[in-house]
């Protein structure tokens, strides 16, 4: 998300250590940062903390640089770690941290937040994979309403699963979510195929911010032959969106990495009623005339498993960021810890210009790396 002042950004951390059953003491947070872009003209290529509300520089990632999600008013409709004496409500486990209980802080065992957007009222919406749920908070991260559920879609981790079968695979929930320019509609993109839907198709659903309900409008996104998942959905206009599509391969294993950004338009459907896709950027083939990463090549590649953020900076510039899948390794080099990399990519064709998209050389304008870290 855009940050508090120009040149800053608001970033969301993943749910913790990669699974619901090992992340009960990981707090769900958003951080405000400022990249110092490494460009052909200079720059350190580092990312630093800023004040979450004012954008003022901070000496470290401290309490002023973040917000922590919480549910002090007990809006969510299911038991949280804060409701238990011991983690996972198991007496054999350690006691739940007192700060989690007293503040009813949300953890990586309560939600797997994968997407976040700010609405017209300044409230935040989080797309979760455990339900999957949409969760509304105020600007401080306090939950304001009961979680919203997509009818007929339930994951194996859902607290509402009961005796019925799951209709969505694990970790296949609201990976992508966009907000329209007016801030009154959200668009969720599932990462996995719902049971009974055609293979390799994903649902995009419209959500009304004012009524806090899904509208019933739905579109079908088809994965490419080489694609296995999506990473993000970002709005260009009321009908046009960017989608990150990828597979699980990296530079060190799993086959040939497939990492691309496509444009879709909800008014443009093929003969099967599925969204027409236009390739915008091949993230494995980005022009790098200044060799910003110093690898000796004039082509920059972005081979990480999960590339999960794309933000439109201006008509010709995209910000793209990967999730380092802490404690993942091997994205670029075997056995080497994966950083989170920030790319500033120049497009030859302006983003808002409808009907003129053509795959043209995308150029790397800036590069930043955030070292692997957890907590703060």
What are the residue ranges of the model-derived segments?
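Single conserved hydrophobic/aromatic residue that forms the stacking wall/gate
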Residues: 128, 359, 375
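Short, threonine-centered small-residue motifs that mark membrane-proximal processing/anchoring sites
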Residues: 348-361
């Amino acid at each position: 998300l855009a940050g508090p002042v120009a040149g800053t950004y608001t970033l969301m951390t993943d749910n913790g250590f990669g699974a619901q059953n090992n992340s009960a003491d990981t707090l769900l947070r958003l951080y405000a940062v400022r990249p110092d872009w490494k460009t052909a003209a200079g720059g350190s290529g580092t990312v630093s903390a800023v004040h979450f509300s004012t954008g003022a520089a901070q000496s470290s990632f401290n309490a002023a640089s973040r917000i922590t999600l919480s549910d002090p008013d007990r809006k969510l409709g299911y038991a949280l770690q804060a409701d238990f004496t011991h983690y996972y409500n198991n007496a054999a486990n350690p006691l739940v941290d007192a700060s989690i209980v007293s503040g009813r802080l949300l953890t990586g065992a309560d939600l797997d937040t994968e997407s976040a957007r700010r609405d017209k009222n300044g409230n935040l919406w989080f797309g979760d994979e455990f339900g999957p749920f949409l969760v509304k908070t105020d600007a401080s991260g306090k939950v304001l309403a009961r979680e919203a559920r997509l009818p007929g879609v339930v994951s194996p981790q859902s607290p509402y699963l009961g005796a019925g079968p799951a209709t969505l695979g694990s970790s296949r929930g609201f990976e992508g979510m966009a907000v329209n320019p007016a801030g009154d509609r959200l668009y969720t993109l599932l990462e996995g195929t719902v049971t009974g839907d055609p293979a390799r198709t994903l649902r995009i659903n419209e959500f009304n911010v004012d009524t806090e309900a899904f509208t019933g409008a739905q579109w079908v996104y088809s994965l490419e032959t080489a694609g296995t998942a999506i990473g993000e959905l970002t709005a260009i206009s009321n009908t046009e969106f960017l989608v990150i599509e990828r597979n699980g391969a990296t530079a060190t294993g799993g086959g040939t990495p497939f990492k691309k950004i496509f444009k879709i338009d909800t008014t443009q459907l093929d003969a099967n009623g599925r969204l027409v896709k236009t390739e915008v950027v091949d993230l494995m083939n980005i022009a790098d005339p200044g060799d910003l990463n110093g690898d000796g090549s004039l082509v920059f590649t972005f081979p990480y498993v999960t590339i999960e953020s794309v933000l439109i900076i201006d008509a010709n510039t995209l910000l793209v960021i990967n999730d380092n899948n802490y404690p993942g390794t091997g994205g670029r080099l075997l056995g080497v810890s994966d950083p989170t990399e920030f790319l500033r990519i120049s497009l030859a064709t302006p983003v808002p210009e409808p009907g003129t998209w053509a795959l043209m050389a995308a150029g790397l304008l800036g590069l930043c790396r955030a070292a692997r870290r957890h907590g703060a």
